[in-house]
Amino acid sequence: MSILYEERLDGALPDVDRTSVLMALREHVPGLEILHTDEEIIPYECDGLSAYRTRPLLVVLPKQMEQVTAILAVCHRLRVPVVTRGAGTGLSGGALPLEKGVLLVMARFKEILDINPVGRRARVQPGVRNLAISQAVAPHNLYYAPDPSSQIACSIGGNVAENAGGVHCLKYGLTVHNLLKIEVQTLDGEALTLGSDALDSPGFDLLALFTGSEGMLGVTTEVTVKLLPKPPVARVLLASFDSVEKAGLAVGDIIANGIIPGGLEMMDNLSIRAAEDFIHAGYPVDAEAILLCELDGVESDVQEDCERVNDILLKAGATDVRLAQDEAERVRFWAGRKNAFPAVGRISPDYYCMDGTIPRRALPGVLEGIARLSQQYDLRVANVFHAGDGNMHPLILFDANEPGEFARAEELGGKILELCVEVGGSISGEHGIGREKINQMCAQFNSDEITTFHAVKAAFDPDGLLNPGKNIPTLHRCAEFGAMHVHHGHLPFPELERF
């Protein structure tokens, strides 16, 4: 089944004319930069999930918020779909353009508007890079906690859209847990403030509803984030294991003992070797799996927790446990993990990154299941996990130049996500649904739940013009997805019209 927008399954889009939209934008949005030739728009035909590509009708790059309002007004009046894009680092096709839609690029809004060290908050524009926030507040001994692997490039607006996490989300939470409020523009011109400067606000929690909505409800125009004081001490333990199953069990043992690490990450042998060859982090390349466990806080507590975790790891079957001897080694240990994705990209022509979550207790069994599926589909899988909260990132290695190999990788990825659902988990932890997992949403949710999701979208976007075909499948798509499952991946009587 095609993962790109298919009107038969995802709903008909308005039939728009490029020239008329271009003329309307030029007339009503003075000074707006508009890209419309093939040479100009090719760089925007995908996000970080480069396997799926579509050239948009137009690309617009506003530099003033008034222009954003005017762009949305024009698109609303002409019934033109709008896809919002931040830095384009997303891994689920959430910012994949539409052939009949305008791509609204928010990358030029990169000003840090205000830093309040006493109130421990910062007010920023949506194009500000994640890491730039921590760099800006570092002189105040503060930082912004969510740290996705792409934090050097990804934008805070995109983080809000996907509810991004990172290696330290086990203790410090996802994006939604680190926001105070956001300013939002709806397609029909309404400006909304969701959340407040206080720790809580009355009424429904629309801030939580909007965070992770993948650009389907409105456009984020400003973000107020919470800041945290830097922990006085942070130490990292690196534990080696002779099996991934033992490493998986050790994760549960640490949490069961009442210890909440700042980060608890797991890598298997394939990802270990790739990262070590790329970063030279000091990883044991003969280990079947490693755990990275960071403990932070005051010196006395960290020292005690390090000793406890060391004992837990050894009892769980660790063949070796190393404590980073200084800050430089701690940074190297984390650099290997944070560069695992590009490292794997060096050992395979292509890779397909999954993002499922499972209960910690299910980790050993799911790892065994992934190994079986890897053999069944004859594709290598490098496993990288936010192990502490059960967020898995299996990287499926393939060669797009080999006919049929990407389709096989897609199918394998879908089976892994469905395995996550079977054990009580979810098809996404932090990358979002986008186009990539639109079919697997049908395995995660029933028709009543999906109908409710559509009702929520309609409350914010009654015309369905904001990022259509992402995140929430139509019931038509789910019916066809179910038919394919019943018939082992093939539609019965494919020559017949479906709906």
From Swiss-Prot:
What does the sequence similarity comment in the record state about its family? Belongs to the FAD-binding oxidoreductase/transferase type 4 family.
- Family matches, as InterPro entries: FAD-bd_oxidored_4_C, FAD-bd_PCMH, FAD-bd_PCMH-like_sf, FAD-bd_PCMH_sub1, FAD-bd_PCMH_sub2, FAD-linked_Oxase-like_C, FAD-linked_OxidoTrans_Type4, GlcD
What is known about this protein's pH dependence?
Optimum pH is 8.0-8.8.
Q: Which residues form the FAD-binding PCMH-type domain?
A: 52-230
> Which EC numbers characterise this protein's activity in its record?
1.1.99.14
| Record-level GO BP terms | DNA damage response; glycolate catabolic process
What is the protein's species of origin? Escherichia coli (strain K12)
One GO molecular-function entry: (S)-2-hydroxy-acid oxidase activity
Query: Any inhibitors or activators noted?
Result: In vitro the glycolate oxidase activity is inhibited by the sulfhydryl inhibitors CuSO4 and PCMB, by KCN, but not by the metal complexing agent EDTA.
**Catalytic reactions on record:** glycolate + A = glyoxylate + AH2; (R)-lactate + A = pyruvate + AH2
What subcellular locations does the record give? Answer: Cell inner membrane
Q: Where is the signal peptide?
A: none
This one is known as: Glycolate oxidase subunit GlcD
* PROSITE patterns the record matches: FAD_PCMH
| Keyword list, A-Z | Cell inner membrane, Cell membrane, FAD, Flavoprotein, Membrane, Oxidoreductase
Induction is noted as:
Induced in the presence of glycolate or glyoxylate. Part of the glcDEFGB operon, which is induced by growth on glycolate, under the positive control of GlcC. Also induced by growth on acetate. Expression of the glc operon is strongly dependent on the integration host factor (IHF) and is repressed by the global respiratory regulator ArcA-P.
Q: Which EC class is this protein assigned?
A: oxidoreductase
Gene disruption phenotype: Abolishes glycolate oxidase activity. Is unable to grow on glycolate as the sole source of carbon, in contrast to wild type.
Q: Which Pfam families match?
A: FAD-oxidase_C, FAD_binding_4
Superkingdom field: Bacteria
Q: Name one GO cellular component term.
A: glycolate oxidase complex
Which cofactor names does the annotation list?
A: FAD
